[in-house]
Amino acid sequence: MECCVCNKIFSSPRGLHIHQSRIHQVGFGTRGGCEAAVHAVRTFVQSDACEVLLKLDVQNAFNSVNRDTLLNEIKMTVPEIYNFLLQCYHCPSKLMHKNNEILSAVGCQQGDPLGPAIFSLTINSIIHSLNSKLNVWYLDDGTLGGDSQTVLADLIQIKNKFKDIGLELNFNKCELYISDNVDSSSASQIIQSFNNIAPSIKNISKDSLHLLGAPIFNEAIPPLLSKSISKFSDYSDRLLKISSHSALFILKFCLLIPKFTYLLRCCPIWKYPHLLRPLDLLLKSQIESILNIRFSEQAWTQATLPIRYGGLGTRKISSVALPAFLASIHSTSDLAGNILKASPATNCEIACLVEASNAWLAGPSQNFPSRPKIQRAWDNIASVSTLNSLLDTAIGRDRARLLASSRPESGQWLHAYPSPNTGTFIDPGTLRIAAGLRLGVAVCADHNCASCGSEVDSLGHHGLACSSGAGRLSRHSALNDILRRALVSAGVPAALEPQIVRNDGKRPDGMSLIPWKMGRALVWDATCADTVAASYVPSTSRRAGAAADTRERQKVAKYSCLGAQYEFVAFGVETLENQYFAP
């Protein structure tokens, strides 16, 4: 209910007043607010306008703000929701602790979807009255910058005015940074002045200045990466104690890149490839342990591509760092510019933008994406360039494998959620072989096939096309069962091995029991071609899906005797490709 009210008000003309506060308050209703604040502060501290930077923290802010002030501010700013919030906040809230009932008469209610918005509106007038050249807040965390006298005066004003509405600064968590442009004697006086107002304020240096979890100066990046390597190593050791599929799934979607995305977008980590290399090597070692395979250099390069380009989706930090940073700057540049233009302090570009753009142009691509605000647009260009370089050096079976793996749907199994209950769990042996075939790495030792006696190399391709192997029949049955179940789930009953034959006496694989199109029943015959079979490599190394296309044309020709009585469809798949349909 509250979410609906909030969205309705914020999208109304009255919401314009609320959105105007985003210049100083980026803590609610602001897409990319944290990133914009970090980029703006990094730009500001590198300008001559920055003498000091003050980080403020409010103690227990949401639970302490005066409710009368909160409601009065709401009544003046957004009267449309005043009556609704009055019902929520005019009486003390009941908090339960075991069997005890505690009445809470101050602060926003715990779990209130409107909590961040109404808290920000409560302190909005105070924030706008400040005179510092840099003035940006994320809810109760404020950052002020400029000359020391103005920032100090704002600190005194905040301390006094916040006290009037029930808020108190937590000086133990407040931090003061003094620019290198300030001489040592002046710096000592500045520190003393701030200590008189905030006795326990911390004086920090470049290597410890962080904003909203992101380092501001380059000096703070190496310690952060060292800490991240240690933490990821601890996580990685635990992954080896669970199933391979679960471990790979967690690694791709929960660890490393997902945890690093915010930092990659906020910080110029791409400038330190020598520091990123240990993380990439740790990732490589971990995936080798999970899948029980060993990567060649080409296989590792392919594995770190997105799934849609033939990889495993386990991205390297060094590959994602620059696209993520460039996308963040372009997507938040307007907001960051508004934060900086709120004062006459800066008329410069966002810090590191030119350097990052030059680094991009110095790479394999000389073009910028048409949609620079989207990270995938940058990543697509880099990934396509990497895939093309792999294709340029690959020949024969390797090229056919790469083309097949980079086709749509061929890597959908890598998105499967590891759940035995839903039938999407992949056992360790199957996962190892599937990944090995996709990447072209050894999956077995050289030996002779137990079924036909043929030589089998370490890549294991023989098992995909062995005419004596048991897997060929089960694979064909599984294909037809999938088709039949798909039709039945769509309300089209179907049967396998119908009572119709072609001229040589052979039957198709299946048929619908009701008309499919223009009064005719659907008849299908499935086939699976080996992408890397010697007879198909000349065509599959030039065009993905060529083997399935050839087999489908053959099927259509064989069943042409059915004439117009049935709607015949050939269903062709490849061992390393997705499905094709030929009517």
Model regions: which residues?
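Active-site-proximal segment of RNA-dependent polymerases
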Residues: 26-56, 60-64, 281, 306
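Basic, alpha-helical interaction scaffolds
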Residues: 123, 194-270, 328-335, 339-340
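Short, conserved micro-motifs composed of acidic
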Residues: 149-151, 156, 160, 168-207
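C-terminal recognition-helix end and immediately following basic linker
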Residues: 1-25
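Active-site metal-binding core of divalent-cation-utilizing nuclease and nuclease-like domains
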Residues: 425-458, 482-532, 538, 547-553, ...
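Extended C-terminal regions of large enzymes
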Residues: 279, 295-435
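Conserved polymerase palm-domain catalytic core
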Residues: 43, 49-155, 172, 178-180
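Short cysteine-rich clusters marking metal-coordination/redox-active sites
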Residues: 3-6, 449-450, 466
